[in-house]
Amino acid sequence: MEGSNQFLGTERIGKLMQKYAIPCIISLLVGALYNIVDQIFIANASYLGSYGNAANTVVFPLTVVALAIAVMIGDGCCAFVSISLGQDEVRKAKRSVGNAVVVCLVSSIVLTAIYLIFADIILAMFGGTVNAETYRHSQEYFFYITLGVPFYMFGQAMNPIIRADGSPRFAMISTLAGAVLNVILDPVFIFGFRWGMMGAAVATVTGQVVTAILAVWYLLHMKIIKPAAGDFALRGKVCSRMLTLGITSFLSQISLVAAMAAINNMIRKYGALDAVFGQEQYAQIPMAVVGIVMKFFQIVISIVVGMAAGCIPIVGFNMGARKSARVKELFTRLLAAEAGVGAVALVLVEIFPRQLIALFGAANESVYYTDFAVRSFRIYLCMIILACVNKACFIFLQAMGKAGESTALSMVREVVFGVGFALLLPHFFGLDGVLYSMPLSDIPTFLMAAYLIVKTYRSLEESHT
């Protein structure tokens, strides 16, 4: 076997986590910043404000659909490659990379076509009709964001594959380059040219194009798993195994889309019944605020997922090499780190909610906006420690090849409990019921995750003895 990946089975676990997890965290944080930076600049543009923020909230789940497909391909290929290399099957690893590229390109083109053809229907499904001004901004933003979907998906899919090739730093740099360009262009297009939602979208897409170009360059210069021309021919067994390994990443994202769709529509419905938010000039506030809360949640989850996803090559290699003691040590360290991230986030939202809100243009908004935002932060994120631990379990189980358990946990959290509570609780508690839906869903999910954690620990101990 090519020796450059052998250190995954011998190097100290803590050092490996730093090498692989930190670049992955930065990459995911930077990826999350694409949409978050847009929302910050939009919110602080007085001619867009909460209407633009609400539009961003409407479109955001649709970018997550693209991300879901991309990470299914990328994370699945990453796990496939890592396990193959651990078993000294380099040829199989190269074949999976070629197949991943083709599947990503085809699926991105299909998704772009669907978005362009059914734009009005899709926006209405995600709450875009809260009022006329929000809908107008949503249409404009969505059109230009859709044009960048193929570039976005390719860049996101290649990121974990580049890490699996032993280049986590390049994966980080490629994502960082696009995000930095987005940050530079956003104020130019929004405040300088006054392009509004179009400007925010064009800045984002430009950054995505840069990331995709860097990913193409790396694909042509891979160190270990560079595919040959014949490896791009689709093979059913390779695609099936790869997508099976990545299905948890897909479902964890796509189920989040289902939850966001339910939340957006319940906000639109019960906001219209509220004494304040039922007025046309304030109707967009709940949608805008919940979008801000979700963006903060996304930042935290990006750190959590980055830690876990960065460990996929380490887990895959050591599972393939039958070094279960190292896998167990990694699992223990990962859970402790994830809980720590959740604790820090909880302190921030409970003590400094107004400072967090201020980033998103609160100075330009009414007192109704600020008060609802403070309440939303404290309610929606009150169980964020459990959410962090749950996410870690989903991805770790996936890395160990236990796609069934991981998929079940992910679906139960977002769809069964998340959507269920989002549809049920507002009947009794109005808008507050919508906010409580996600934290409440983390409690039963954690109990299920705890059972699987204990079961996994025992299986690792048995395989080691």
Report each predicted region and the residues it spans.
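Short alpha-helical transmembrane segments in multi-pass integral membrane proteins
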Residues: M1-A21, V81-G148, G192-I247, V315-M383, ...
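N-terminal transmembrane alpha-helices
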Residues: G9-L48, P61-G76, F80, L105-T112, ...
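Transmembrane helical elements of multi-pass membrane transporters/channels
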Residues: K19-D38, Y144, G178, G207-T211, ...
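Transmembrane alpha-helix boundary and packing residues in multipass membrane permease domains
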Residues: C24, L28, I40, A79, ...
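Short runs within selected transmembrane alpha-helices of multi-pass transporters and secretion channels
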Residues: S27, G74, Y144-R163, A171-A179, ...
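Helix-terminus/linker motif at the lipid-water interface of multi-pass membrane proteins
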Residues: L29, L33-A54, L123-A132, V188-W195, ...
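Small-residue hotspots at the loop-to-helix junctions and early N-terminal turns
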Residues: S50-P61, S138, F142, A201, ...
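Small-residue-rich hydrophobic transmembrane alpha-helices
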Residues: N53-A113, Y152-A171, M287-V347, I351-P353, ...
